[in-house]
Each structure stands twice: as C-alpha cells, then as structure tokens.
C-alpha cells in the first residue's frame, strides 16, 4: 500500500502487477457487482471456448487463440476502471478499432453502452474481425484515425467514460500525438483511455535483429489493412500521452500473446526470468484531466 500525490490510499492489486487503484474501489458495490458478473472470461480458455461454436476461418481461430490471454488481461483492466468510476450503469465505453474483443465487452457489460469507432470496410476486416461477425452499426462511428491530422475532419461522439484503443496505434501512419489529441476529445473529463500495443523492444524482436532478420512485418499491399507502420516503446508512449494532454495512470509490460511452438516456449521461459522491458505487450492507462 502507498499514498498518491492526491493523498488517497492506494492498493497495488496483485492481479494488476503494479497498477495503482484507490483502495475504496475494491469496497464499493459497483466493483462487487462487476466481480460477480464477469466470471466467464477470466481465463483465456473461456474466451476460446466462447467462440468455438462459430463457423470461423482458420485465420480467425488462430487469431483468437493467440489473443485470448490478452483479451482476458484487457477485460480485467476495463473492469477495474469501471468499478473505480463508482457510478450506476450505464457506463459509456468506446472501443476504437472493433474486433472480437468488442463482443466480449458487450457480453461482460450488458447494462452499459458500447460504442465503436474506426473503419467498417470489408478490406479492413481480417482474422481479428471477420465480416460475418455481429456488429452493431447503430453504435458505430466511422472515422479514419489517420485523419486526426486534420482537425476540420474531426467527428464527435457521446463522451466516453472509458475508451479502449487496443492494438490500433501501430497501424496508423499519422503521428500518434495527433491521434491521441483527437481521441481525447471523445472522452469526458476524468475519463480513461486504455492503450495496448506491441513492444518493439521485446526479446523476440531483439533476437531477430541480432540474427540479421528484420523484426517487423513488411507493409501490406492493402491500403485499408496495411499492417504495422510504427511500434512505440514504453518511454515513447508516456511522452506521447503527456504531449496529447493525458495523465499517465499506469503502464505495464506483459506477455499476453500465445503462440504454440517449441521456440515460443523457450522465449516465454527467457522472458519470464528477464526484465519487464523484454515482454511482448504494453498496456497503458491514461486519464483525461478534469
């Protein structure tokens, strides 16, 4: 336990590995209700099972197996923030870049408002969000985040209590500070933004470079789904977030991508005994100041 600069007592949740939350968050009725509600997606195996009955392509099934642990990790962070808002439903969520996670969010928070923002082109769909996946167009706001460099093209949405931008920022060619400045306009004062993105300095990528292999994917020949343009380190993301007008509430590096291979098992073992800077994913919680 420690005390923040605001004088609140803070509890370091063991399951949150270093994220700081006011201890009152764990005692309010909203948190207890969320804990009772979200019992189905605590483990990655439950997420894989949830989608098993679907007639999904092998690409989509592989994507779910790879990202199920990340989805469970992200849902835990979302639940903690939702509990900390200490307000009755509906909470307004904005999922930037809809995916399978959007469905998990809707199932986990049935009383709340789930909005989405981003592309809705067939070309932009892929293993992460196939065309036959259900999508509520009534709560979807179409916007190309690369247009964040043009303030006259900004759109508005109902202000979000919690926005989620998971595995999105690395797909954009527009400067990330401009993107986050736009996203900031979609969040209410005191609201939160969760950013998830791959760690460009992970152990696997360092080893690839050491072996003379390029650690990053070639940009694809698909303007609507080009792959990764740029990945950002923890230090870069902190600086970008502050420049965009956010407060950094927490940051964690974690190994939440699952790959079934002997090489992956060896890398997992090495990462588990190395510094956190070698882990594969970065999750950052940002707050819009009041």
Residue positions per predicted region:
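S-adenosyl-L-methionine-dependent methyltransferase catalytic module, highlighting the catalytic core
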Residues: 33, 37, 41-77, 100, ...
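Glycine-rich helix-loop-beta junction characteristic of Rossmann-like nucleotide cofactor-binding loops
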Residues: 76-87
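Short catalytic micro-motifs in class I SAM-dependent methyltransferases
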Residues: 166-171
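Conserved SAM-binding motif I beta-strand of class I
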Residues: 113-119
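Conserved SAM-binding loop of SAM-dependent methyltransferases across substrates and taxa
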Residues: 100-111
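Conserved class I S-adenosyl-L-methionine
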Residues: 88-99
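Glycine-rich phosphate-binding loop signature in dinucleotide/nucleotide-binding domains
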Residues: 85-88, 154-158
């Amino acid at each position: 336990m420690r005390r923040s600069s605001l004088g609140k007592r803070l509890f370091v949740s063991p399951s949150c590995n270093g994220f700081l939350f006011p201890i009152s968050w764990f005692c309010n009725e909203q948190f207890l209700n969320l804990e009772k509600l979200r019992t189905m997606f605590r483990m990655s195996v439950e997420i894989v099972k949830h989608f098993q009955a679907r007639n999904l392509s092998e690409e989509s099934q592989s994507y779910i197996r790879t990202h199920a642990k990340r989805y469970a990790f992200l849902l835990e962070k979302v639940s903690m923030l939702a509990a900390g808002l200490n307000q009755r439903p509906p909470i307004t969520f904005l999922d930037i870049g809809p995916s399978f996670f959007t469905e998990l969010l809707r199932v986990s928070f049935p009383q709340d408002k789930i909005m989405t923002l981003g592309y809705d082109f067939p070309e932009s769909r892929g293993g992460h969000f196939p065309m036959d996946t259900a999508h509520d167009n009534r709560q979807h706001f179409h916007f190309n985040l690369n247009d964040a460099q043009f303030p006259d093209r900004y759109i508005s949405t109902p202000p979000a209590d919690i926005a989620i931008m998971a595995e999105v920022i690395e797909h954009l060619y527009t400067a990330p500070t401009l993107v986050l400045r736009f996203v900031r306009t979609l969040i209410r004062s005191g609201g939160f933004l969760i950013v998830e993105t791959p760690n460009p300095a992970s152990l696997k990528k360092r080893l690839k470079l050491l072996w003379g292999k390029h650690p990053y994917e070639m940009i694809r020949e698909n303007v609507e789904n080009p792959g990764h343009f740029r990945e950002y380190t923890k230090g870069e993301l902190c600086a970008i977030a502050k420049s965009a007008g956010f407060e950094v509430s927490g940051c964690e590096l974690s190994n939440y991508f699952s790959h079934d291979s002997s090489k992956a098992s060896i890398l997992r073992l090495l990462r588990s005994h190395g510094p956190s800077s070698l882990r594969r994913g970065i999750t950052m919680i940002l707050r819009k100041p009041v």
